[in-house]
Amino acid sequence: LFGETSEKIDFGTRSKTLITSFKIAEAKAIYLDSSPVRSRIEAKKYTTPIRHGSVTYYGPFIFADDHVGGKGHREKLGALCGFLQSGPYGQAKDYYNRAVEEEIGIPPRDPKRRSGTSSVRPW
């Protein structure tokens, strides 16, 4: 339903070259007929800075909230499988959520007040 997403991370090498590139697996379909939905979802690009580089997400994203179990946090539906295959899920999810919040204009929150994100250090 959501297509394939790639993440590219530049860790700030002296040559400014991309040293890590990996793909997030295609999400499992959660809709009986995904083709009409997929054709209507416009691909978007979100970039967020991290220490010594940035994380960029690109693809046709759909966001969810309480009505699909997001519990108030914007989630990328169907991407859980891919994040789990791509390394530390919590850190990747936090980077992604921060990028989305910046894109839609939500100011950053105080990292000390955030709950459930103790694995991420403030930058």
UniProtKB/Swiss-Prot annotation:
Transmembrane segments: none
Any one of the GO CC terms: virion component
Segments for region (Disordered): 104-123
Kinase in keyword set: no
Organism of derivation: Viral hemorrhagic septicemia virus (strain 07-71) (VHSV)
Intracellular or extracellular location(s): Virion
Entry keyword annotation includes Amino-acid biosynthesis: no
GO terms of molecular function: structural constituent of virion
Stated family: Belongs to the novirhabdovirus matrix protein family.
Swiss-Prot/TrEMBL keywords: Viral matrix protein, Virion
Protein's UniProt name: Matrix protein
Pfam family, one: Rhabdo_matrix
